[in-house]
Amino acid sequence: MSSGRIVQIIGAVIDVEFPRDSVPSIYDALKVQGAETTLEVQQQLGDGVVRTIAMGSTEGLKRGLDVNNTGAAISVPVGKATLGRIMDVLGNPIDEAGPIGEEERWGIHRPAPSFAEQAGGNDLLETGIKVIDLVCPFAKGGKVGLFGGAGVGKTVNMMELIRNIAIEHSGYSVFAGVGERTREGNDFYHEMKDSNVLDKVALVYGQMNEPPGNRLRVALTGLTMAEKFRDEGNDVLLFVDNIYRYTLAGTEVSALLGRMPSAVGYQPTLAEEMGVLQERITSTKQGSITSIQAVYVPADDLTDPSPATTFAHLDATVVLSRDIASLGIYPAVDPLDSTSRQLDPNVIGNEHYETARGVQYVLQRYKELKDIIAILGMDELSETDKQLVSRARKIQRFLSQPFFVAEVFTGSPGKYVSLKDTIAGFKGILNGDYDHLPEQAFYMVGGIDEAIEKAKKL
């Protein structure tokens, strides 16, 4: 085990000098003597100097301190011992419930499964959320992104998906909180505890207030734990909130590492960093990882390099829209912008496919007619267009749904709608079976039967 000393500190980036014959390898973990800090080697600058990122605060460090090379990458606890626990980026417990007591530790830098090992599947994953099951159905073992600007409901949607899938699903889940609010992490922990599923979830947090090194690596820590469960033959759920903060942490340290910034100030290695993470989130012949990732969209611009790079890796994209949220329709999913690889008649069947496309056609046509309505009013439309607009407004309202996790705010009990009921309801609206009901009846209800009941009271 070689040792060196600190020669330079700039924020989270620390240069360490080692004897030339024992320079640490890239990604080796170094320990600072007399401090709790772990450093990860990023570059070899020559002359025995390595440039590292601190996995923790650099307060109290100074030049000349001794640093020991552990000779291996950062490793974290894996396996059943992690279930029901909250850990940080290094796998240390932060829930004040004693040591993890793991039997095995894995390094967080691992190769992605080879092409021959990967397995694809077409099984649908029912979420109980109408708009998602209808327009952008999820695949078991697929990757899903929830895209949205600030305050349109990414985290609430994610929490509802966790409640509906993780609680109905009997396997293990891993939640990686990457650069998000501590309050949300706390809420999530209690939500899991109250639902009695905490013993099936491993939680890994690197909050907003953590240094960039933690936020850059915490996603890999969570992923490593999920990979262990997958390789044991389980179907695992991996939730990541938020992928954008992972990119942002890379941006924060990129300039300090001496790289030239690229478009919009992002790191030049943006696509590679995203690929390293996303290529490991995959299903193999042993087991599957189904991942649901929240993606913050800066300034509501989906063409920003960060969300644009994420799009390429996903099987389904759920786009949350500020315009829909402003109408009071929650979940604010845009049914015209959201897509899924599963939306194929050979996978989901003709009835589902035609209903989904029918809903999209009606909403698209309504969008086109809005300008005419704004200028000339409804009276100038043809009878068929008037009927279409009326159905579109019903569909728009029927796409809303009360959530279990938002009961405290809305005061109305949450609803889980099966895929069969979802298809039947929208098919009925498209066929004109409910043309006689007022559009208010379709707002914030579960299945179509509730809308019929609600109409009787209006």
Curated annotation (Swiss-Prot):
Protein's cellular compartments: Cell inner membrane
PROSITE patterns, A to Z: ATPASE_ALPHA_BETA (PS00152)
Membrane topology value: Peripheral membrane protein
Keyword Zinc: no
UniProt cross-references to Gene3D superfamilies, sorted A to Z: 2.40.10.170, Bovine Mitochondrial F1-atpase, Atp Synthase Beta Chain, Chain D, domain 3 (1.10.1140.10), P-loop containing nucleotide triphosphate hydrolases (3.40.50.300)
Major enzyme class: translocase
GO CC annotations, alphabetized: plasma membrane; proton-transporting ATP synthase complex
SUPFAM superfamilies linked: C-terminal domain of alpha and beta subunits of F1 ATP synthase (SSF47917), N-terminal domain of alpha and beta subunits of F1 ATP synthase (SSF50615), P-loop containing nucleoside triphosphate hydrolases (SSF52540)
Reactions that this protein is recorded to catalyse: ATP + H2O + 4 H(+)(in) = ADP + phosphate + 5 H(+)(out)
Residue sites binding ATP per the record: 148-155
Quaternary structure note: F-type ATPases have 2 components, CF(1) - the catalytic core - and CF(0) - the membrane proton channel. CF(1) has five subunits: alpha(3), beta(3), gamma(1), delta(1), epsilon(1). CF(0) has three main subunits: a(1), b(2) and c(9-12). The alpha and beta chains form an alternating ring which encloses part of the gamma chain. CF(1) is attached to CF(0) by a central stalk formed by the gamma and epsilon chains, while a peripheral stalk is formed by the delta and b chains.
PANTHER family: ATP SYNTHASE, ATP SYNTHASE SUBUNIT BETA, MITOCHONDRIAL
Family: Belongs to the ATPase alpha/beta chains family.
Function noted in UniProt: Produces ATP from ADP in the presence of a proton gradient across the membrane. The catalytic sites are hosted primarily by the beta subunits.
Protein name, as recorded: ATP synthase subunit beta
